[in-house]
């Protein structure tokens, strides 16, 4: 989806004027262009195309944990950010680990809500691996909630649990044990930014 940067720049100028600012003053003169460039970068997930290469024949649990992501809330255009944890049981094929990170980026770098993003990641992991046994957990802080409204930055946790992970409680618990060191509260403590 190509972004119309000229329209974004015009809209940002109008917003600046609407709040009583002078878009030509020092410090704001380049803001419309910077905002357009920012949206182009933050929304690059719409242009994601990926071919998947399968590697080894495997059946053991695969977990990629603590994948950092940034997204934009579609309701307020404010960031939400956090970590994603992806687990799946291969059905004879394993995709490259970097592909899992790219899938998270594909769906986080869009106007989003966390619930839909988590489901989309799980769907794509299932499609890419050919496995119905997928578990995706996302943990995020939403600035639309932290900076406005209730003004509370409590993390939101969303899980998409499919296949064996739904049926086998011990398997689900194993994933939670594996991801524990990479949970959002620990990542933030280690400096997310």
From Swiss-Prot:
One Gene Ontology term, aspect cellular component: cytoplasm
Top-level taxon in the UniProt lineage: Archaea
Key words, A-Z: GTP-binding, Hydrolase, Metal-binding, Nucleotide-binding, One-carbon metabolism, Zinc
Pfam families linked to this entry: GTP_cyclohydroI (PF01227)
GO terms classed as biological process: one-carbon metabolic process; tetrahydrobiopterin biosynthetic process; tetrahydrofolate biosynthetic process
EC number(s) given by UniProt: 3.5.4.16
Recorded metabolic or biological pathway in which this protein acts: Cofactor biosynthesis; 7,8-dihydroneopterin triphosphate biosynthesis; 7,8-dihydroneopterin triphosphate from GTP: step 1/1
Positions that bind Zn(2+): 73, 76, 144
Catalytic activity: GTP + H2O = 7,8-dihydroneopterin 3'-triphosphate + formate + H(+)
Molecular functions (GO terms): GTP binding; GTP cyclohydrolase I activity; zinc ion binding
Chain segments annotated as coiled-coil in the UniProt record: none
Similarity comment: family membership: Belongs to the GTP cyclohydrolase I family.
Subunit structure: Homomer.
Designated name of the protein: GTP cyclohydrolase 1
Organism: Hyperthermus butylicus (strain DSM 5456 / JCM 9403 / PLM1-5)
């Amino acid at each position: 989806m190509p972004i119309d940067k000229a329209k974004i720049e015009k809209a940002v100028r109008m917003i600046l004027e609407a709040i009583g600012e002078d878009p030509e003053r020092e410090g704001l003169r380049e803001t419309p262009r910077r905002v357009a460039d920012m949206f182009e970068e933050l929304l690059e997930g719409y242009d994601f195309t990926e071919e998947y290469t399968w590697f080894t024949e495997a059946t053991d649990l695969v977990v990629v944990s603590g994948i950092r992501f940034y997204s934009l809330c579609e309701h307020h255009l404010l960031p939400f950010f956090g970590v994603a944890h992806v687990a799946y049981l291969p059905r004879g094929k394993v995709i490259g680990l970097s592909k899992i990170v790219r899938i998270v980026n594909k769906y986080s770098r869009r106007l989003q809500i966390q619930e839909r993003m988590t489901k989309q990641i799980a769907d794509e992991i299932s499609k890419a691996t050919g496995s119905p046994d997928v578990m995706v957990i996302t943990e995020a802080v939403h600035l639309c909630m932290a900076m406005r409204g209730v003004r509370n930055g409590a993390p939101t946790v969303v899980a998409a649990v499919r296949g064996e992970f739904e049926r086998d409680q011990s398997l689900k618990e194993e994933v939670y044990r594996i991801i524990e060191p990479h949970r959002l509260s620990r990542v933030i403590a280690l400096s997310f930014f």
